[in-house]
Amino acid sequence: MIPGMLDEVLDVLEREGISYTLIEYPEKNRKSIDIIARGKQRRFVIKISNDRPSKEETRDLKNFSAVVGSMPVMVTDDTEEDIAIGKDNVIGLSVEGLAKALRGEKIFIYRTRGGIFIKIRSDVLRRKRTEMNYSMGDLSKILGVTRKTIYDYENGESDVSIEVAEKLIDLFGDEVIGDVCDDALPKLEPDSQPTDTISSRIAKNLTDAGFASAPIRFTAVDVVASRGLKKVLVTVEPKNQDQLEKKLREASKIANELMSELVIVVKSASMAKRLDKDGFKILTSESIDSLSDEINRSD
C-alpha cells in the first residue's frame, strides 16, 4: 500500500462524509483489506495498491466481500477517473473513481485485456427493444452486430463497445447504460489453503452448518461466515504474542463495522480465561468442531 494514496482515499472518505473503518493489521506483511466503507448505495471493501496484488490477496478480498455482501475494490493509479479496470471479479478504480462510486454515481466504462467496454443494463435493453417493436434481427442490423451478439447483450453475457453504446443511446436513451458496481458482488472461490489448518477446519465446520464461509489469510480475522442476516468473524490467536493485542483490536473494529459476532480461538485455557475477562467470546482450538453449536446457541 502506498501511504500517499491511502491519504488521498482517506481525504475522499472524510470529504464525502462516509462512515469507514481503517484496518491496520497486519502492519508489515501483505494485507488484503485496508478499509471498509459504507457508500451511498453499498458497502465497499477496499484494498489500496500500486503493485500487482498476489492471487492470494485478491482471493481474500473477493471471498471476504462475497460472504459479507459487499463490493470489493482495488484502488490503483493504473486507470483514469471515469474508467474502471475489470479483472477476476474485482473492480479497479482510481481515487477519483472511488469517490464517484461512494456517491452512487454511475461508472460505466471499464477496461480489460480485451479492450474498453461500456456496461449496459440487459433488462432495460430487452424491454426497450420489445416496446419499440424491434426484432433481434432489426437491432443487429442497426448496430452492425450479429443476432447472437444481441442475444448475449440481453442475457448479460456481453457488454458493448463505445460505438455500439452511442447507437443504443440514440435508440433507447441513456437508461440503457449500466454501472459496473451493480454487478460487482463476487462469488466464493475455493479454499487453496491446506485443509488441516485451523482456519480451514473452522470454515468447513461452518459451511457444513449452512453458513457461507471462507478462510482469510491476510487480515485480522481468519474466517468469515454468514447465514441470512447473521455474520460471524473468527480470529485465531497468532503465533507471535506481540501481535495479539493489535490483531484483536483490529478484528474488533471489523466486527463493529459489519455488526457481526466475533469469536476468538485460543490455544490454552489460561489465554481463554484472560481474554474472557476482557469480554471476548472465546473458544479453545480443541473445541473448534463445536463452533457452529456455540453460534447457534447465541442466536
UniProtKB/Swiss-Prot annotation:
Q: Which SMART domains match?
A: HTH_XRE
Enumerate the GO terms in the molecular function aspect: DNA binding; DNA-binding transcription factor activity
PROSITE patterns recorded? HTH_CROC1 (PS50943)
Q: Which UniProt keywords apply?
A: DNA-binding, Transcription, Transcription regulation
- Where's the HTH cro/C1-type domain? 125-180
**Residues annotated as DNA-binding region?**
136-155
Q: Which Pfam families match?
A: HTH_3
UniProt protein name:
Putative HTH-type transcriptional regulatory protein Msed_1725
Q: Does the keyword Chloroplast apply?
A: no
Keyword Transcription on entry: yes
SUPFAM superfamilies for the chain: lambda repressor-like DNA-binding domains
Query: Which InterPro entries does its entry note?
Result: Arc_TR_HTH, Cro/C1-type_HTH, Lambda_DNA-bd_dom_sf
Please give the HAMAP family that the UniProt record associates with this protein.
HTH_type_cro_C1
